[in-house]
Amino acid sequence: MDRVYEIPEEPNVVPIASLEDVIRGPNPRFTFPFSILFSTFLYCGEAASALYMVRIYRKNNETFWMTYTFSFFMFSSIMVQLTLIFVHRDLAKDRPLSLFMHLILLGPVIRCLEAMIKYLTLWKKEGQEEPYVSLTRKKMLIDGQEVLIEWEVGHSIRTLAMHRNAYKRMSQIQAFLGSVPQLTYQLYVTLISAEVPLGRAVLMFFSLISVTYGATLCNMLAIQIKYDDYKIRLGPVEVLCITIWRTLEITSRLMILVLFSATLKLKAVPFLVLNFLIILFEPWVKFWRSGAQMPNNIEKNFSRVGTLVVLISVTILYAGINFSCWSAMQLKLADRDLVDKGQNWGHMGLHYSVRLVENVIMVLVFKYFGVKVLLNYSHSLMAIQLIIAYLISIGFMLLFFQYLHPLRSLFTHNVVDYLHCICCRRHHRERVENSETSCEPDTRQSIV
């Protein structure tokens, strides 16, 4: 992951204990925006491979497969264009070229060129002071102590940072509203057709990379949103742990969904739709039960209709993420930030418990009712491998939150404390039940 600007690991001043005092940090350094190039590459690669498969399906008169492949591509592409326009606020600006590129679904390409031009401009002017700067304050943990650091951020660096943030949100939209259904459907087609042409393999590869990248960004954005006052860094070990966790979680979940759908075919549709609708309406049910008012300050130029459209879009994205993996945050529609900034161990535990039960049920359905989908491969072995892969992903998730989270020292309770609390409650309940049963004979004897 790239950082558009960063500050050194340790400020070149003596740390102080009081947060009321401010350490003046050095001028930020800008780095090459690799993530913008990578997101654009994923978008173009998935779009090109999807259109190629649409052409192949049309040539082979496979209208049903062609329709779904094209629909998933178009929906995610349109949502990507709207996301970039919304983040950059282009509707209030006179930028006909950018709007035209978005109209022909090439908005990420022109935005990537703009970001590269901005980077080259900064590179040529390196060492020169910008006339327009703003002050940014963030907390940092240095030797276990919170230190408030202030530094100047130039207008050009802030513009490049806005491009980076826009592409992060674009990658999430593409991953969970386009790549997840595309990957699931292409896996299903491969399963029932018993062949893997090169074009479909390339499309599934791009979709899998996009989903894994989007899920990894979910964790990073969740940490940034929950700890907005802190300057956060994720090292290579932390990013590797998140990537392994998300890859195992998503691949095992999607494979189980595909095998379940291939087993029951149309009978699986009501279960999957009901599952998605429960996730979709859960935040709205909590919002209505709380009796809170709809937030009217998400964007200062938004009407109530515009705010409602944003809330619905965010809810659809939230449901799409939670359908395939954990969203790393809990949606809270009554809040201006739209997320619950608490740690929410209970929400995380509930999600993985429910998903584990669902996966086991779907795997059992495939094992006992499924047809022979893969030659020379045991259904029992396949079912065990998928469940083990999902359990390993949960293990990497617990490892990250227990030992690798960048701000784990701020947790009031960690994973071990939560598990210990559950075990203590269960042990205490068993002791109470045993004491009650042991007292019953003594009571009866005293009565006699």
From Swiss-Prot:
Statement: the UniProt record of this protein carries the keyword Magnesium: no
Bilayer disposition of the protein: Multi-pass membrane protein
Keyword annotations: Membrane, Transmembrane, Transmembrane helix
Pfam families per the UniProt record, alphabetical: XK-related (PF09815)
Alphabetical list of InterPro entries matching this protein: XK-rel, XK-related_adapter
Annotated transmembrane regions: 34-54, 67-87, 97-117, 173-193, 203-223, 268-288, 305-325, 356-376, 381-401
Principal location listed in the UniProt entry: membrane
Coiled coil: none
GO CC term, one of those recorded: plasma membrane
PANTHER family: MEMBRANE TRANSPORT PROTEIN XK FAMILY MEMBER (PTHR14297), XK-RELATED PROTEIN 2 (PTHR14297:SF4)
Similarity comment: family membership: Belongs to the XK family.
Protein's name according to its UniProt entry: XK-related protein 2
Gene: Xkrx
